[in-house]
């Protein structure tokens, strides 16, 4: 269903409000600075708790709650009474090992989740100011505790391969997007006839890096344009008009396996440069036929998994888990979805007083962005500048408020007024299990519970395997770890610079890892040229990184904070 919107209003919302003028760039910059500061804050909490052990170990629930409170504290000091909306665009999630998305347990969860040595931990968070969104994801490695803050040796194995590939791919794409300001500076191996940066170039570069490290790009990875109030927060619920971006799903692994059966080379192979490229795409279906244009903002969100521990050919896919999973004879991990998003296309007359109160709070505070139930507590956010004892008391008070919030959320969810965002894990399914399975209905069965973008409902089109059939094959698969790096960049045409709003060396330093793989010569040369372009201040691309605020921290509390 498409809403009836006047063309004049659509132009204002989708075009005029997304022009990167000085005011809009400043809103993006401040949102990026807040996001960067929060990432540094939660990284410090983890280091103090698990690496340096200068404070008691914090649970994942406490880490998420403290970071969300810290985000709101920073937001409250910016654009006071100057914008109508500002808030958390992506609740803090901490996904460990095979967990991919959405794991942010509430503080009233009876189980205590701790991090362990050797875990790969992905932190994701984000904020928006007046709808201009900044998000970040960064993967950390939990090393054995050490007094000098330095591990005894690098991480090895498939996790190290994935971390290397993910870091290289993210940094390369950042520079590649910046080359849209001066396409003549593109490396020779990446140039095309139209002398532009296209979606096909982006996909081929990322896939070539993944293949070189024996990795797979996990379904759900994307490099997409971000616009005001449109940052992918409702994918699978609302189809976004004029979608522009590169998206990976299982069908691309299928095509990759077909290609590898004929060619085992991992060299960078470009598509036909004479193929016409679309610059205007009004469809909601993702396609690689687009051109990166200066004046746009992009979210780079790459997730990878290493295959060095896997001795067979197969497909990496995702599985949605809930609180019913694992309650049979299999001891699978189970958890309740804790992140919700409001569906404004649905209305219903509610019966419970708690439901009406909660819905009013949601409509007033959270807009079109995801939220957690503890956000609606009268004791949220926690004052992170309080003493540790006071912080623990505030956390306990929020846990008490969660009882009524859960009761109200149950009716809202049953009436589809709010939609839970699923918790996803990565799984590896052997190809032989897919080929030997019976598939009488073909590819016509669609899993309505799995959030996918339009046009990607059939995961394996060449094999004729539907999403329902692939879901039934998950029991034959095995869990596999994943890593993730995400950054937001703004291509500022006015100052001829690429502004990196999140990530980078300031807050998302690469982990100490060692991979047994290396880049082939041609790909190594291409990436080397991209690095040279980013470092050359005179003839290269100007890349400006947003740095975090200066924060002095003591265990859970913040002692002082300097805001520009």
Swiss-Prot record:
One of its GO terms (biological process) is ribosomal large subunit export from nucleus. GO terms for cellular component: cytoplasm; nucleolus; nucleoplasm; preribosome, large subunit precursor. Keywords: Cytoplasm, Hydrolase, Metal-binding, Metalloprotease, Nucleus, Protease. One of its GO terms (molecular function) is metallopeptidase activity. It is an enzyme of class 3 (hydrolase). It comes from the Eukaryota. Its main location: cytoplasm. InterPro entries: Creatinase/aminopeptidase-like, PA2G4/ARX1, Pept_M24, WH-like_DNA-bd_sf. The keyword Nucleus applies. Its EC number is 3.-.-.-. Signal peptide: none annotated. It is found in: Cytoplasm; Nucleus. Component of the nucleoplasmic and cytoplasmic pre-60S ribosomal particles. Belongs to the peptidase M24 family. Probable metalloprotease involved in proper assembly of pre-ribosomal particles during the biogenesis of the 60S ribosomal subunit. Accompanies the pre-60S particles to the cytoplasm. This is Probable metalloprotease ARX1. It comes from Candida albicans (strain SC5314 / ATCC MYA-2876) (Yeast). The lineage of its organism: Eukaryota, Fungi, Dikarya, Ascomycota, Saccharomycotina. The gene is ARX1.
């Amino acid at each position: 269903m498409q809403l009836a919107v006047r063309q004049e209003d659509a132009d204002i919302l989708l075009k005029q409000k997304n022009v990167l003028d000085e005011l809009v760039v400043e809103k993006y910059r401040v949102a990026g600075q807040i996001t960067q500061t929060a990432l540094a804050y939660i990284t410090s909490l983890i280091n103090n708790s698990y690496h340096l052990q200068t404070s008691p170990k914090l649970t994942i629930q406490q880490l998420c709650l403290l970071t969300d409170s810290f985000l709101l504290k920073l937001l409250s000091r910016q654009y006071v009474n100057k914008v109508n909306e500002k808030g958390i665009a992506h609740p803090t999630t901490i996904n460990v090992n095979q967990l991919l998305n959405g794991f942010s347990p509430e503080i009233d969860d009876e189980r205590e989740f701790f991090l362990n040595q050797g875990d790969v931990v992905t932190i994701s968070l984000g904020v928006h100011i007046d709808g201009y969104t900044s998000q970040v994801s960064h993967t950390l490695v939990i090393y054995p505790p050490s007094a000098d803050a330095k591990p005894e040796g690098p991480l090895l194995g498939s996790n190290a391969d994935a971390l290397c590939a993910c870091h290289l791919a993210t940094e390369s794409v950042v520079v590649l997007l910046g080359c849209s300001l001066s396409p003549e500076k593109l490396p020779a191996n990446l140039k095309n006839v139209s002398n532009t940066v296209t979606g096909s170039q982006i996909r081929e570069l990322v896939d070539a890096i993944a293949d070189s490290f024996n990795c797979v790009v996990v379904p759900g990875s994307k490099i997409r344009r971000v616009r005001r109030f449109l940052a992918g927060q409702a994918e699978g619920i609302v189809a976004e008009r004029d979608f522009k971006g590169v998206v990976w799903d299982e069908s691309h692994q299928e095509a990759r396996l077909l290609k590898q059966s004929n060619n085992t080379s991992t060299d960078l192979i470009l598509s036909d440069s004479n193929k016409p490229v679309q610059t205007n795409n009004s469809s909601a279906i993702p396609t690689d036929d687009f051109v990166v244009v200066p004046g746009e903002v992009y979210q780079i969100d790459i997730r990878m998994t290493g295959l060095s521990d896997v001795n067979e050919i197969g497909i990496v896919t995702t599985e949605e888990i809930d609180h019913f999973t694992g309650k049979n004879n299999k001891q699978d991990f189970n958890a309740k979805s804790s992140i919700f998003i409001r569906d404004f296309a649905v209305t219903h007359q509610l019966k419970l007083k708690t439901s009406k109160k909660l819905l009013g709070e949601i409509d007033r505070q959270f807009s079109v962005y995801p939220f957690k139930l503890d956000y609606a507590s009268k004791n949220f956010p926690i004052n992170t500048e309080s003493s540790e004892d006071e912080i623990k008391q505030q956390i306990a008070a929020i846990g008490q408020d969660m009882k009524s919030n859960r009761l109200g959320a149950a009716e809202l969810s049953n009436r589809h007024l709010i939609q839970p965002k699923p918790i996803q894990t990565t799984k590896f399914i052997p190809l032989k299990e897919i080929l030997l399975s019976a598939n009488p209905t073909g590819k016509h069965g669609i899993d309505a519970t799995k959030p996918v973008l339009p046009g990607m409902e059939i995961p394996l089109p060449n094999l004729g395997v539907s999403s329902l059939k692939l879901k039934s094959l998950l029991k034959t698969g095995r869990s596999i770890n994943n890593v993730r790096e995400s950054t937001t960049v703004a291509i500022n045409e006015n100052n001829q610079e690429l502004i990196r709003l999140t990530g980078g060396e300031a807050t998302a330093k690469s982990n100490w890892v060692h991979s047994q793989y290396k880049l082939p010569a041609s790909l190594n040369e291409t990436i080397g040229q991209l690095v040279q372009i980013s470092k050359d201040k005179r003839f290269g691309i100007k890349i400006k990184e947003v740095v975090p605020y200066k924060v002095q921290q003591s265990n859970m509390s913040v002692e002082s904070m300097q805001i520009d």
